[in-house]
Amino acid sequence: MADDSYKTIKQIAEGYYTEKRSRFISYAIPVRTVEEVKEQLEKYRKQYYDARHVCWAYMLGPERQTFRANDDGEPSSTAGKPILGQINSYELTDLLIVVVRYFGGIELGTSGLIVAYRTAAAEAISAAEIEERTVDEDITVVFEYPYLNGIMRIVKEDNPAIISQKFEMDCEMTLRIRKGEAERLKNRLLKVETAYLKE
C-alpha cells in the first residue's frame, strides 16, 4: 500500500462467537478521533450494562500511531491485546473494536480468553466492508486573472478536486489532491506566471 493511503471500514459491522457457553458479541466501528471512541464506548457500555466485560481496542490515523487496548477486568493482555492484534493483522486504522462478553459459567483460562477475543474481533472485521482511502493535501494557489487559462489547463490535466475558487483581479483556488501527487502539482502551478502558493 502506498504511503498516502490507508485501509479502514465503511460502516459498523457485527460478529459473534461462543465458547463454553460464554457469548462474545463484537462490533467493528469506524472512528476518526479519541472523542468518537469515548462516545462509542459509552454507548456500548450502556447498551450492554448487564454484560460481564466490555473489552476494546482502537487504532487511529493514517500512520497508525494512536492506539489503545483495554481488558475491562479480564486477566491482563487476554482481551484488548488480541483485539488490537486483529486490527494490526488486517492493517486497518480509524477503527474501534468492542467485544462484549456474557459469562457462561465456565472459566476459559488465559489461552481460551485470548482465542475467544481474537476470534470475536476477527468475526466483526470479516463482516465489515474494507475500503482504501487516500491521504490528501490541500493547495491554495493565488494568481492574476489573465493567467486563469494556464491554471485551469493544469487542473484539467492533474484532476485535483476544486475545494473553493474566487475570481477577481487576484484569483484564488484551493485544490485537494492525493499527497503523493501534491509536490508535482505545486511545481506545475508555480510555473504559471504570477502564481504563488498561499500557506
For each predicted feature, which ranges?
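Non-DNA-binding regulatory cores of transcription-related proteins
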Residues: 162-179
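Helix N-cap motif at beta-to-alpha junctions
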Residues: 33-34, 144-148, 176-183
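Conserved short beta-strand edge segments in small beta-sheet-based binding/regulatory domains
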Residues: 161-167, 192-199
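Short amphipathic alpha-helix segments
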Residues: 142-159
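Active-site beta-strand/loop microenvironment that shapes enzyme catalytic pockets
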Residues: 79-127
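Signal for well-folded cores of large energy- and translation-related assemblies
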Residues: 45, 87-88, 118, 122-129, ...
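Short glycine-/aliphatic-rich beta-strand segments at the starts of folded cytosolic domains
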Residues: 129-145, 173-175
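C-terminal regulatory domains involved in ligand/effector binding and gene-expression control
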Residues: 1-77, 164
